[in-house]
UniProtKB/Swiss-Prot annotation:
Annotated protein name in UniProt: Extracellular giant hemoglobin major globin subunit B1
Species, as recorded: Oligobrachia mashikoi (Beard worm)
Localization of this protein: Secreted
Stated family: Belongs to the globin family.
Binding sites annotated in the UniProt record for heme b: H112
Quaternary state and interactors: The 400 kDa hemoglobin consists of a spherical 24-mer arranged as a double layer of dome-shaped dodecamers. Each dodecamer is composed of the 3-fold trimer of the tetramer A1-A2-B1-B2 having one intra-tetramer (A1-B2) disulfide bond and one inter-tetramer (B1-B2) disulfide bond per tetramer.
UniProt function note: The extracellular giant hemoglobin is able to bind and transport oxygen and sulfide simultaneously and reversibly at two different sites.
Residues in Globin domain copies: 18-161
A GO-annotated cellular component: hemoglobin complex
């Protein structure tokens, strides 16, 4: 019974307790394979555009809310994709150092508070899109670890939005 209560609490919260150090290490390793490995036909912008495509499909957020309107041939949109993917890279790679990660997430939260129209729900959808694309690129991805750790990141960035 105690294990069930603990499991349900963890699943409901998807918080720091759920993105354990082991989860974080798995996510960092798998992100490295997706983000940094030289995979044939894949690049940072291709992965980033796939993340945004998944985000637009699941969130209901209009591509027009972003520079370049979601056009994968538009340099303004590709610059936005690069900023988001780079931010995700830094956040993911800081997961094993919670003080650094929390400071970064607080900084990203402040940046997003200054942008009209950004919501916590949209941040959550984007984090889920990242997990979804990782699972597509890396079929052996540990999706539970991704869900826990991306929920932690989304909660930090999206707090109060």
């Amino acid at each position: 019974m105690t294990i069930l209560v603990l499991f349900l609490s963890c699943a409901a919260l998807a918080s720091a307790e759920c993105c354990s150090r082991g989860d974080a290490e798995v996510v960092i390793s798998e992100w490295d394979q997706v983000f940094n490995a030289a995979m044939a036909g894949s690049s940072e912008s291709a992965v980033g555009v796939a993340i945004f495509d998944a985000f637009f499909a699941s969130s209901g957020v209009s591509p027009s809310m972003f520079p370049g309107g979601g056009d994968s041939n538009n340099p303004e949109f590709l610059a936005q994709v690069s900023r988001v993917v780079s931010g995700a890279d830094i956040a993911i790679n800081s997961l094993t150092n919670r003080a650094t990660c929390d400071s970064l997430l607080s900084h990203l939260n402040a940046q997003h508070r200054a942008i009209s129209g950004v919501t916590g729900a949209a941040v959550t959808h984007l984090s889920q899109a990242i997990s979804s694309v990782v699972a597509q690129v890396l079929p052996s991805a540990h999706i539970d670890a991704w869900e826990y750790c991306m929920a932690y990141i989304a909660a930090g960035i999206g707090a109060g939005l």
